[in-house]
Each structure stands twice: as C-alpha cells, then as structure tokens.
Amino acid sequence: MSVPTVLEKILARKAEEVAERSARVSLAELETLARAADAPRGFARALQDQVKLKQPAVIAEIKKASPSKGVIRENFVPADIAKSYEKGGATCLSVLTDVDYFQGADAYLQQARAACKLPVIRKDFMIDPYQIVEARALGADCVLLIVAALDDARMAELAAVAKGVGLDVLVEVHDGDELERALKTLDTPLVGVNNRNLHTFEVNLETTLDLLPRIPRERLVITESGILNRADVELMEISDVYSFLVGEAFMRAESPGSELQRLFFPERGVPVSGSTLD
C-alpha cells in the first residue's frame, strides 16, 4: 500500500470536516447566511483592472503555518496584516481557513475582510458544495478550486454553486493535464498556476513559464508560490505575467505590507513607521 501524499491526507481530513460542520449547521441555514452577507467586492474584476495597466496585481496571503514549513508567523493578527497589505499596495487578499494543516480559521477571513476594502479569496481545499456556500456566508468574494483535488464533474458542480451565490472562482493547476482539464471544464477568467507540487510540496517557478503558452490570452494567469525576491517578480513580468499570489515572503517579514511594497513597487520606496505592521 502506497504512503498517502500530503494532498491526499488533507483531502481525507477535509471530507471528515465537511461532515462534522454540516451536522452542526445545515446547508439551508448557510444559504440564509450567504444571502445576508455583504455584497461581493469583485475579486476577478480587481485583478483584471490592475493587469490591464500592466501593474502588479498582488493577492497577498494571510497564512500562519503550512505543512511543509510549520509555523511561519508567530505575531499573527489577521486584521492588522490585512491593513498592512492594503497600505502596501495589495489588490486582493487570500486567507487560509484550513484548521488542521495550515492553522487557519474562518474567523481570520472575517477579521481580515472587515479591516480593509480589498476583495478576499477563501483559501481552502474545496470538495463539497457546502463549503462554497459557507465561503459566501463568511463574506468571501472568491473561492479556490484545485484541479488536483477534484474530478471534472465535481469541479463543474462547485463552480456552478459558486456562480449561484455570487462568488468568483480561481482555478488552480500545476501541470499540463490539470490545465487542459481546467480549460475544458470551467469558463472562469482566473487561472492560477501553482509552482508548488501539492503531492510533494516542492517548488519550481518554471512551472508557470512552461504552462503559459498553453493558456488562452483572455484568461488571467496568476503565478502562485515561490515568489521570494525582485528577480522572481521580474522573471514573471518579462513573460507578461502580472498577477501574483504571495504568502510566505510577506509572512516572514516584520512588516508584511512593507515587504509587499519592496518586492512589487520598489519605485514608491518603503514606508518608515514605528509600527511593525504599517
């Protein structure tokens, strides 16, 4: 019997989590909460508007820990981090809500969104329509669909549920086969290329560059994972990739927003402040 990969372990636990949550709060109750939630802020539109100007469209991630790195940030106050990111020039936020493997929480998404005006994606392993409705009830503006975690029928079902509740969809791929499935199954304009292999958690920036020629121009490409310095940013920009999802590089910095500005908007200079998060 083969040893389960990291992704397989996460998905097995996620199925248990969905069962536990749906036993506590029914889908009908969630749908009521979703209808009462603040209107979506337009996640895809915000990225598209920035990319049209050939300016970095940064999805700044709020992430306390990961399976591969353990705890990434000890001083973890989502509302303060969100404000710092907004000040530093982020276009959108990504908030980890997975509890068991990333030490995330639903409350972190709510706190971050309430602290700023940026659109927010719920970063989690979505496998069930329940989670999609739950995301909207929490106030999310977008959800992540990971092709490696879903078959085509479920992927299409989740995207349809997302559209029904007013959520944008970011579909995430890692290789050519996943990209082909995503393009065939979904019409979302947002295609994220994860440079991290979710089975091994190894990172290679060439993943984005290799897949880029196969992605239609009308789709917006977001490079995810492994962007750590200006050279990485410039490598993507010369290839006409202007949207980035970055977490660890910011989370390890004393001031996440200042690090965002340093990496993506160096011409603005880095703000000097007494606060570690300003």
From Swiss-Prot:
> Which Gene Ontology BP annotations are present?
L-tryptophan biosynthetic process
The metabolic or biological pathway listed in the UniProt record of this protein is:
Amino-acid biosynthesis; L-tryptophan biosynthesis; L-tryptophan from chorismate: step 4/5
Write the record's keywords in alphabetical order, separated by commas. Amino-acid biosynthesis, Aromatic amino acid biosynthesis, Decarboxylase, Lyase, Tryptophan biosynthesis
A single Gene Ontology molecular function, please? indole-3-glycerol-phosphate synthase activity
What InterPro entries is this protein classified in?
Answer: Aldolase_TIM (IPR013785), Indole-3-glycerol_P_synth (IPR045186), Indole-3-glycerol_P_synth_dom (IPR013798), Indole-3-GlycerolPSynthase_CS (IPR001468), RibuloseP-bd_barrel (IPR011060)
User: Which reaction is recorded as catalysed by this protein?
Assistant: 1-(2-carboxyphenylamino)-1-deoxy-D-ribulose 5-phosphate + H(+) = (1S,2R)-1-C-(indol-3-yl)glycerol 3-phosphate + CO2 + H2O
- EC number of the protein: 4.1.1.48
Which top EC class is named for this enzyme in its record?
A: lyase
Q: Does the keyword Kinase apply?
A: no
Keyword Amino-acid biosynthesis in annotation:
yes
What family is this protein classified in?
Answer: Belongs to the TrpC family.
Q: Which HAMAP family match?
A: IGPS_B
What PANTHER family does the record point to?
A: INDOLE-3-GLYCEROL-PHOSPHATE SYNTHASE, TRYPTOPHAN BIOSYNTHESIS PROTEIN
* Name of the protein in question: Indole-3-glycerol phosphate synthase
Q: Which organism is it from?
A: Pseudomonas fluorescens (strain ATCC BAA-477 / NRRL B-23932 / Pf-5)
**What's the encoding gene here?**
trpC
